[in-house]
């Protein structure tokens, strides 16, 4: 895979092997094939969902910067038929397509506000019924699936010896999911539905002709991703991502379906899962009712960019406790970044440092100046398992040195940093009119101190806290981050 020598290669934790591995395109065309599970469009996505989508967005941006936009193919699906969408149609008394179209539009608007690039392809489950039926018939022909007495079709888990490799779940430990109510129709309680026979009292008018020998009905949840990946990306993809809640059973089932239908071909060469967002120490979810939507937060006066920034403040593979205090800190940080960029933009061209790039024949950026050490540190942090808190720490180290420093980044390099993080600085919203203005120097020191704490560099963390105190501010640690308050 051709790459620039400007920064270290992108490496990412692989949930299957439990190791850090470099990302690489596997096909001869050099195109990196990347899939992430999208939303179920029956209600607004909450910011816990968007944490995962923002993580995927940063991955997409880094890959495009590294390989070129034409060498990345990103697919994200929309689940527009499943138990929850159908339940919502019964609840509202409206057609399925009308409800899912409404929430799809809302999801797209929120993604745009949060700065997420749209996928290259966004297939829907209802738009790929034929592909799902074809895959189910393939599995039935190969003996991996069977028709139950009620006309449904189930995947026979014991036909796939590698089942559980991703989640490390053994057969005796398999969860009995909410499909257990249909266990009378299964060969084994752990088998999962590929096709659900039509039930008039539950499904209303939602049904399609089934696979050969099966009843009319609708696809199960898991088969859609396998079918859409095969159609739009092929039998083997380079990266599959999603939230940790999808690791089992959804992603485990995808592997089983795809590899059985495709003759054992590796389904995904790399798996990455982001962790839960917490509220008051509890996982944020619609079922618990303890969630924020983007609209909830913008109604309180916070900008979408502040939400994005706050969600970047914790490592994607670690749980992050979300608070409104973190949004206040994010708004202030964004203001500091705006001011810094304005100073860079105002510098005469003659003041810009002259640097020579280290290049190789494979580099696509041979004519660009070499990045400053600060910019290099930031990208290396992102390339090292998406270490976003370390990247933000490196960003504010740059800012703290000042726009006039001899090693200040060029405006082009700073804009490349902003692109990688997906931070749009064009909007400026003051959500804390009564709060005293925090000096840029204090904010920068606080970001550095937080990064030092995360790195367990206690000596540096204590020294930075003392510097903050000397400037008249108290930095108070919280589970999810920190707050800054003027000292009395």
Where do the model's predicted regions map?
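Short, glycine/charge-rich beta-strand/loop segments that flank catalytic centers
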Residues: 78-81, 104-107, 117-132, 150-159
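Alpha-helical recognition segments enriched in aromatics with Gly/Pro capping
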Residues: 2-42, 53, 57, 71, ...
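Short Gly/Ser/Thr- and Asp/Glu-enriched loop/turn motifs at secondary-structure junctions
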Residues: 118, 148-150, 477-481
């Amino acid at each position: 895979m051709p790459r620039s020598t400007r920064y270290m290669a992108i490496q990412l934790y692989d949930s299957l092997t439990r190791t850090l591995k470099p990302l690489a395109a596997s096909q001869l065309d050099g195109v990196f094939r990347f899939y992430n599970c999208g939303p179920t469009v029956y209600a607004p996505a909450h910011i816990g969902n968007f944490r995962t989508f923002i993580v995927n967005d940063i991955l997409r941006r880094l890959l495009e910067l590294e390989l070129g936009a034409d060498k990345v193919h990103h697919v994200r699906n929309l689940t527009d038929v499943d138990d929850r969408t159908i339940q919502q149609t019964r609840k509202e008394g409206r057609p399925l397509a009308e409800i899912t179209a409404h929430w799809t539009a809302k999801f797209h608007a929120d993604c745009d506000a949060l700065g997420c690039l749209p996928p290259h392809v966004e297939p829907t489950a209802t738009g790929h019924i034929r592909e799902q039926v074809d895959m189910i018939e393939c599995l039935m022909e190969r003996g991996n699936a069977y028709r139950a007495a009620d006309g449904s079709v189930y995947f026979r888990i014991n036909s796939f010896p590698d089942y559980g490799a991703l989640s490390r779940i053994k057969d005796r430990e398999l969860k009995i999911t909410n499909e257990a109510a249909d266990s009378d129709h299964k060969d084994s309680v752990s088998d999962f539905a590929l096709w659900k026979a039509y039930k008039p009292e539950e499904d209303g008018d939602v049904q399609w002709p089934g696979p050969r020998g099966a009843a009319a009905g609708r696809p199960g949840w898991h088969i859609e991703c396998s079918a859409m990946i095969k159609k739009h990306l092929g039998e083997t993809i380079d990266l599959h991502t999603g939230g940790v809640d999808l690791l089992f059973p959804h992603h485990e089932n995808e592997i089983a379906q795809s590899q059985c239908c495709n003759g054992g071909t590796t389904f995904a060469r790399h798996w990455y899962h982001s962790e839960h967002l917490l509220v008051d120490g509890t996982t944020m979810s619609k079922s618990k009712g303890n969630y924020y939507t983007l609209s909830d937060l913008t109604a309180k006066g916070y900008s979408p960019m502040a939400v994005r920034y706050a969600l970047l403040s914790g490592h994607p593979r670690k749980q992050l406790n979300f608070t409104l205090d973190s949004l206040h800190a994010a708004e202030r940080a964004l203001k500091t970044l705006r001011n810094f960029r304005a100073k860079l933009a105002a510098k005469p061209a003659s003041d810009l440092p002259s640097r020579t790039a280290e290049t190789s024949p494979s580099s696509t950026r041979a004519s660009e100046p070499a990045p400053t050490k600060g910019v290099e540190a930031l990208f290396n942090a992102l390339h090292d398992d998406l270490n976003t808190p370390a990247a933000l720490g490196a960003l504010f180290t740059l800012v703290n040195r000042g726009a006039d420093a001899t090693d200040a980044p060029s405006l082009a390099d700073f804009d490349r940093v902003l692109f990688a993080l997906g931070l749009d600085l064009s909007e400026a919203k003051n959500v804390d009119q009564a709060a005293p203005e925090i000096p840029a120097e204090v904010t920068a020191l606080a970001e550095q101190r937080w990064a030092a704490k995360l790195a367990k560099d206690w000596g540096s963390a204590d020294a930075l806290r003392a510097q903050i105190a000397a400037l008249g501010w108290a930095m108070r640690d919280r589970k999810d981050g920190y707050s800054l308050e003027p000292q009395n």
